[in-house]
Amino acid sequence: MEEEFLSFKNFLQEDQDKREKIIRLSREITIQSKRMIFLLHQTSSSDGFPLPKDFDRTSIFEKKIHKELESLKRELAGLNADKFSSACTHGLQEYVEAVTFKFWLQTGTLLSCKDSSFRISINFIDYVLGVCDMTGEIMRFLVTNGSKFSVQQLTQQVKFLRGLHKNCSEIEHLPSKVKSELQQKLSVMENSISKVEGICYSKILREADKRYLNLEVDTATPPEEKRLRST
């Protein structure tokens, strides 16, 4: 009996040690992913949109993330990987947010869940939750740089964000805990979309005002002055 209890105690201790190691790896992935996102905001504001396909200024963080992901894959290898998914979900969500934001800055589109850019197999739930967070980065980017975009470009991004929200809100048969987290992220996403819509509407109004003022000036200018200006 004593040997059985000792064996069970060792099993629980090994389980706890593995969980703590996975949590540490997840935290490091989160930290490096946040640094990557911060640098993406800095460089995209100065380098313009879209970023070149061979953009590599975030490679210093990506290499660190890839190293942690390799360690995480080793820890998750085996039949009990699902048991530890909650220990690494936040790190993987942040990783998805960083990678998809970079891809959006390069292409203006969404990176697929199965794309080889991800250095680890991403489950669909972590992917969706990470993409929801990524829309907040798009909003922050457009708030800072919206004046550089045309009405057509801004309208395109509004449609893109609305489409993401629609697709994410239609996902069904989720565990109650995941469903609650998704609903919270969708609520934040709605606020982000509203801000981007506001940027777009303001741009439309400013351009309409300019056209109206130009028309007013043109109408008020005497014909003689118009002829002098044209010669």
From Swiss-Prot:
Pfam families: Translin. One of its GO terms (biological process) is RNA processing. Keywords: Cytoplasm, Nucleus. One of its GO terms (cellular component) is nucleus. It comes from the Eukaryota. The keyword Cytoplasm applies. InterPro entries: Translin_C, Translin_fam, Translin_N, Translin_sf. It is found in: Cytoplasm; Nucleus. Disruption phenotype: Deletion of both tsn1 and trax results in slightly stimulated cell proliferation. One of its GO terms (molecular function) is RNA binding. Belongs to the translin family. This is Translin-associated protein X homolog. The lineage of its organism: Eukaryota, Fungi, Dikarya, Ascomycota, Taphrinomycotina.
